[in-house]
UniProtKB/Swiss-Prot annotation:
SMART domains xref list: AAA
Region: Disordered, residue numbers: 289-313
UniProt cross-references to SUPFAM superfamilies, sorted A to Z: P-loop containing nucleoside triphosphate hydrolases (SSF52540)
InterPro entries found in the cross-reference section: AAA+_ATPase, AAA_lid_3, ATPase_AAA_core, ATPase_AAA_CS, FIGNL1_ATPase, MT-severing_AAA_ATPase, P-loop_NTPase, Spast_Vps4_C
Purpose: May be involved in DNA double-strand break (DBS) repair via homologous recombination (HR). May regulate osteoblast proliferation and differentiation.
Entry note about domains: The N-terminus is necessary for its recruitment to DNA damage sites.
Name of the gene encoding the protein in the UniProt record: fignl1
Species annotation: Xenopus laevis
Cell compartment(s), UniProt: Nucleus; Cytoplasm; Cytoplasm, Perinuclear region
Record's GO cellular component terms: nuclear chromosome; perinuclear region of cytoplasm
Protein name: Fidgetin-like protein 1
Amino acid sequence: MQIPETSSVHQNEWQRDVFVLSSGTCLPQQKAEVYRAHLAQIQYAWANSEISEASAVHLFKKYAEKYSAILDSDKLEIGLNNYADSILTMAKCQRNESDKWQSSLTTNNVLKLKSVQEMAEAGRRAQLSLLNSTDASVRVGNEIGTSGYSTVLAHNVLRNPSHAVPHAASSDCQIPEGSSNFLQNSKVSAFTKANTSSNTLINNSIPINTSLMQRNEVKAPTTFSTQSGPNVFSSTTSVYSGKRKACYALGDESTDIQPKPLVQRQLASKEATGDSDFKTAKEQLWVDQQKKHSNQPQRNPGPLYGGGKKSLGAARSRGLHGKFIPPLPRQEDVEDSNRKVYGQGNSEMNSTSDEHLKNIEPKMIELIMSEIMDHGPPLNWDDIAGLEFAKTTIKEIVVWPMLRPDIFTGLRGPPKGILLFGPPGTGKTLIGKCIACQSGATFFSISASSLTSKWVGEGEKMVRALFTVARCHQPAVIFIDEIDSLLSQRGEGEHESSRRIKTEFLVQLDGATTSSEDRILVVGATNRPQEIDEAARRRLVKRLYIPLPEASARKQIVVSLMSKEHCSLTEQEVEAIVLQADGFSGADMTQLCREAALGPIRSIQLMDISTITAEQVRPIAYIDFQSAFLVVRPSVSQKDLELYENWNKTFGCGR
């Protein structure tokens, strides 16, 4: 069957899409699909140099505008209404981050409130009273000035002698426009009161409500700081309620007037009393977080939408009905820590490896390192029976160049790919693994299923990540079992994702971005070599035929397997078994020995199977192999052997 050219196929698709657009029954969904197909075809044509860059930009802009007009139109007749409730419902659980997001709650808006203006007026009246008399009393009731704040501030300052008032007064805070009177008056009244009547505060000139102080210690006060963002004030409704829920504290990040958190104060009190055996989940989590972030520099958090709760006033203590905080870290924290640990670099990787892996997703690297990279026991060439020509050829072109790259340079360099084809069960997988073991290379074993994904674009990303990790672990051997399923011939009815995976694999194997110094060998094994794509066959330079084992190889398999069992076979009986097993593959010989090993077990009576010991089981005899030949048959037909031999004569590199 003659395959049509790619250009004719794309032309037919373009004409079909134009007819769909011109029809009067075309729905908006169909129009969007057509324009999306046009964009993909334009990108494909530009990538293959079929059109110029200027033409591609012009066409892409033209159809992108048409596509956007259909998506964003709110009319059901001509658009899809991209801002409909159904679309927003799908995206409502997604995190929305934006550096340009600004809150509508600003300091100027708060200062315009009536209650805040009354507080400012009360502060000015308190300032006048302080100027007239240094020993002013504090009124607690419906009208409270900032002298109440000065009482609390002075009490906190006097409790901590290290926090002197001049040190606190040296901290400057940024006062927004329009709020200078209120903040300056409050600041002047606070520190004037703290300086002139500190002794009076200790005595009884100004009464201090101890219950008020306890409540203020429990709740973390809101501070005016030099950080960017809207300043948060205490609740204005509590000013006239007679219950002070929070106090103000002036100072920037350099001041230490702020009280410690509740959990830290509780831990300190428990350690002082000696009762520190039991810790709640919240306390334990706080301790773990302090240990975790003790050596890390503090940084401003990113602008997360909904990440931090903004409120007016201090947080209300939730008590028993509060949110439960588990003592174990969250899954997001574990993933972030794992990424940080991995980002610090493995001791086996140099700086070049880190540069290669920085653009690869950590999950893909972890998948390749844990599942695709093989960590099985080592193999020797003696473990593979027969196949002397294949083993000798592989040693010459693969193993020796990897062991001595200084000698095998230039034209003596190893090939990029090897294809092992032949009947199933002849040891192709063992040869691929033995190459990695004998050359000291890292062995990657993949299949078509390990590179496919239900998400668009994930397959080619996995292929790119595989070769990137292999370049970081050179020398490396990438073994592809059943390579015909991954690199089959590309046709018209092939899925687009499968085509992209093949293209990416061929580019990584031998493309413009590959380096001749990379010591990466791709070994493919297949029992259907006629289905491999022509481009892949060209890149797999050495194509070795792995035939059925000869008589000497079959004898070696029988002797090797029977040496581990209790048997009574003579040399003549072994020769007879080998001659009778003509046409058997290596896997068939193994199955034959397994079936013969069950012969002594089948000869035991059913009533004696539970009481007989292992020493009383008779050895494996020649009659057991005769019974096994009645059950086990060759898995390769003569017709298949002729197909392999003909393909070997046409494309093979063997004798």
